[in-house]
Regions:
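N-terminal, active-site-proximal structural segment of metallo-dependent hydrolase catalytic domains
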Residues: 9-95, 103-115, 185, 282-285, ...
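Active-site environment of divalent metal-dependent phosphoester hydrolases
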Residues: 82-84, 110-112, 169-171, 210-216, ...
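Metal-dependent phosphoester-hydrolase catalytic domains
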Residues: 189-203, 210-317
Length: 317
């Protein structure tokens, strides 16, 4: 009789909407003039580097786990402008010694907003990656690509990752609902393709869905066997969700995982370190500490808070 000793390795996954992580240079092909020195935000090189280091600090703090600390293994980011921003974030900011690598989309979004995946190559080795382009339906503006990445994790299993930033509710929730359903339909098709090749795959879908856990789009993913690993996530310093609007906490950011990974979940939480919060003077309690309040520069972090989910992976010794 053969006896195997299984060791536990942990994988920490973070999702974070950075809120307008733009560089300070104008892209003539995009509507990004607002975030330039001449634009309405007076977005200078100094403000840009402040923002990069603030986002870095937020990511680093996601690794705090009680008395222990470790850098996240994978970080899904929304609202990053381009490859140049990601290079500065991973190679020149406070993250420069973390040895992170990254993958980023180049979407047709009119403002130039993209999604990206940061990864520790010691714990995740990409095998293939490509964008899933969303063909706009009638009345829908060009939107962000979905980033798909498949890679090897420490157990030598394949992990499939989708990074999503779904169309917003601007113009009303009901009129824009089909836009987000289109994202869900695209993801369900991709999941089906993966399952044709693997009966029990490891899948993570993470990002800003601009929808709640009980929305039709999220329910469609659940009907396709995905579980919401962040449904019970709470902060420890007053955050009840990742996003606060007019005094109401709501989670529009989600980390959805396949059944197999859901069984490996250790915890899901909101990273609401006190330095990422400020008093909510109008509605009470606290709120995310943003880069701007209206048009006033605050040198904050984001209007979203990061989600953190940790998994325990079994590997044979």
């Amino acid at each position: 009789m053969n006896t195997f000793l299984f060791l536990t390795a942990f994988l920490t996954f973070v999702e974070f909407n950075c809120e307008n992580l733009f560089d300070f240079r104008h892209d003539s092909l995009k509507n990004d003039i607002e975030f330039t020195p001449e634009g309405d935000r007076k977005w200078t090189e100094r403000k840009y580097w402040n923002k990069l280091n603030n986002i870095s600090k937020a990511i680093i703090s996601c690794g705090i786990d009680g008395k222990d600390w470790h850098l996240p293994d994978l970080v899904a980011l929304c609202e990053v402008e381009n490859d140049s921003v990601m290079r500065d974030l991973t190679k020149r900011s406070l993250l420069r010694n973390a040895n992170y690598e990254y993958l980023v989309t180049n979407s047709p979004d009119e403002r130039g907003i993209d999604v990206a995946l940061i990864y520790d190559p010691m714990h995740f080795q990409p095998i293939r990656h490509y964008p899933l382009r969303i063909k706009p339906m009638e009345g829908m503006r060009p939107t962000r690509d979905i980033l798909y990445v498949a890679g090897r994790i420490i157990t030598d299993d394949t992990l499939h990752i989708f990074v999503v930033h779904a169309p917003s509710r601007y113009g009303g929730e009901k009129p824009t609902r089909p836009h987000r359903m289109l994202i869900a339909k695209t993801l369900c098709g991709a999941i089906d393709s993966i399952r044709l090749a693997s009966s029990d795959p490891n899948i993570i879908i993470a990002g800003d869905f601009n929808d709640y856990a009980d929305s039709k789009a999220l329910m469609q993913l659940q009907l396709h066997g995905m579980k919401n690993a962040s449904h019970d996530a709470k902060g420890s310093n007053g955050a009840k969700a990742t996003y606060k609007y007019k005094g109401e906490w709501n989670s529009i950011d989600h980390i959805m995982v396949s059944q197999r990974l859901y069984g490996m979940k250790v915890f899901g939480r909101i990273n609401d370190q006190t330095f990422m919060l400020e008093p909510d003077e109008k509605y009470g309690g606290v709120q995310p500490y943003r880069t701007y309040r209206a048009w006033r520069y605050r040198n904050g972090y984001s209007d979203h808070l990061p989600l953190v989910v940790r998994f325990a992976l079994k590997q044979p010794d």
